[in-house]
Curated annotation (Swiss-Prot):
Domain of life the protein comes from: Bacteria
Compartment(s): Cytoplasm
GO MF, any single term: 3-deoxy-8-phosphooctulonate synthase activity
GO cellular component: cytoplasm
Associated pathway: Carbohydrate biosynthesis; 3-deoxy-D-manno-octulosonate biosynthesis; 3-deoxy-D-manno-octulosonate from D-ribulose 5-phosphate: step 2/3; Bacterial outer membrane biogenesis; lipopolysaccharide biosynthesis
Protein name: 2-dehydro-3-deoxyphosphooctonate aldolase
EC number from the UniProt entry: 2.5.1.55
Lineage: Bacteria, Pseudomonadati, Pseudomonadota, Gammaproteobacteria, Thiotrichales
Gene this chain is encoded by: kdsA
Catalysed reaction equations from the record: D-arabinose 5-phosphate + phosphoenolpyruvate + H2O = 3-deoxy-alpha-D-manno-2-octulosonate-8-phosphate + phosphate
The entry's keywords: Cytoplasm, Lipopolysaccharide biosynthesis, Transferase
Gene Ontology BP, a term: keto-3-deoxy-D-manno-octulosonic acid biosynthetic process
Similarity field: Belongs to the KdsA family.
Length: 277
């Protein structure tokens, strides 16, 4: 599959979707996009910048949601123009999809909306690549039907993304077998290494997270066989306005990316026995 000018797939080099959880300010967006571009260019990792203009799925009405669609899209356009990177953002049921599609390069659907047929198909009708997140409540093989809905409206630029599975209260678990199952959709599989360590609602009015486990799950997912990694990152996660406990610090990103790239190359050089009939 062609994505933002580069090839993605289980037989292609690992790509990265990364950026702060939410657009906090124009300055933060420009600075983080620039840092991430510099890092990924140096390592030769294809890169898409990610940040959200609105976080609809919040633990509390007091949680920061973002700058809104108009200001958020203006900033994402500026990131594209000044930094020269493709951009991704997530959309919701009340999103003006045509406005978003006029700016971004990739759309992303939230995990909690994965079974909303009209929503999934309306997003896919925009004609852009779509990263569809698997619901935390959903079996990996059930993504077959979600992909079928997307393809029914003529969109073959579909990625499927695993962000963990509910495991009791306030806890997620990552079953690496699910990544192999999701490969059977024929779509590039993306692993969300930061939301997978989230503890949803675990701090009462906000979600917690086990940031120290991000590298563990990222390495495991790459060893299992994926096309790309989704990772939210921030210069100061402790003071981030959204999802700080599970974001990875930009200052510690380079060694992690180096490990991820090397591991991906080794795994893909040997292929995947489980996919051979």
């Amino acid at each position: 599959m062609k994505l933002c000018g580069f090839d993605v797939g289980i037989d292609q080099p690992l790509f990265l979707i990364a950026g702060p959880c939410v657009i906090e300010s124009e300055q933060l967006a420009i600075e983080t996009a620039g840092q991430l571009k510099e890092l990924t260019d140096a390592l030769g990792i294809p890169f898409i910048y990610k940040s959200s203009y609105d976080k609809a799925n919040r633990s509390s009405t007091k949680s920061f949601r973002g700058l809104g669609v108009e200001e958020g899209l203006r900033i994402l356009q500026k990131v594209k123009d000044e930094i020269g990177v493709p951009v991704l953002t997530d959309v919701h049921e009340d999103t003006p999809l045509d406005e978003v599609a006029s700016v971004v390069d990739v759309m992303q659907t939230p995990a909690f909306l994965v079974r909303q047929t009209n929503f999934i198909q309306n997003v896919c009708r925009q004609g852009l690549p779509v990263n569809i997140k698997k619901g935390q409540f959903q079996a990996p093989w059930d993504m077959d039907q979600v992909v079928a809905k997307a393809r029914e409206v003529g969109n073959d630029q579909i990625m499927v993304c695993d962000r963990g599975t509910s495991f009791g209260y306030n806890t997620l678990i990552s079953d690496m077998r699910g990544l192999a199952s999701m490969r059977q959709t024929g779509c590039p599989v993306v692993f969300d290494a930061t939301h997978s360590v989230q503890q949803p609602g675990g701090q009462g009015t906000t979600s917690g997270g086990q940031r120290e486990m991000v590298p563990v799950l990222a390495r495991a997912a790459i060893a299992a066989g994926i096309s790309g990694v989704f990772m939210e990152t921030h210069p100061d996660p402790e003071n981030a306005l959204s999802d700080g406990p599970n974001m990875w610090p930009i200052s510690r990103l380079k060694p992690l990316l180096e490990t991820m790239k090397e591991l991906d190359e080794v795994v893909k050089r040997h292929g995947f026995i489980e996919d051979q009939s």
